[in-house]
Amino acid sequence: NLQYLKNMIKCTNTRHWLSFTNYGCYCG
């Protein structure tokens, strides 16, 4: 899932991710 990877990379880069789901991750 390309969108999942994009979300994961974005959250990892910001070091501000909250949780990972089947659809990606939620940033807070």
From Swiss-Prot:
The UniProt record lists the keyword Secreted: yes
Keyword terms, alphabetized: Calcium, Hydrolase, Lipid degradation, Lipid metabolism, Neurotoxin, Presynaptic neurotoxin, Secreted, Toxin
Functional summary from the UniProt entry: Snake venom phospholipase A2 (PLA2) that inhibits neuromuscular transmission by blocking acetylcholine release from the nerve termini. PLA2 catalyzes the calcium-dependent hydrolysis of the 2-acyl groups in 3-sn-phosphoglycerides.
Signal sequence range: none
Tissue-specificity statement: Expressed by the venom gland.
Catalytic activity: a 1,2-diacyl-sn-glycero-3-phosphocholine + H2O = a 1-acyl-sn-glycero-3-phosphocholine + a fatty acid + H(+)
Gene Ontology cellular-component annotations: extracellular region
E.C. designation(s): 3.1.1.4
Cofactor note (record): Binds 1 Ca(2+) ion.
MF terms (GO), sorted A to Z: phospholipase A2 activity; toxin activity
Disulfide bonds: none
Cofactor section: Ca(2+)
UniProt subcellular location: Secreted
Name this polypeptide is given: Phospholipase A2 2
Family indicated by similarity: Belongs to the phospholipase A2 family. Group I subfamily.
Keyword Hydrolase set for record: yes
Broad class of the protein's primary localization: secreted
Biological process per Gene Ontology, one example term: phospholipid metabolic process
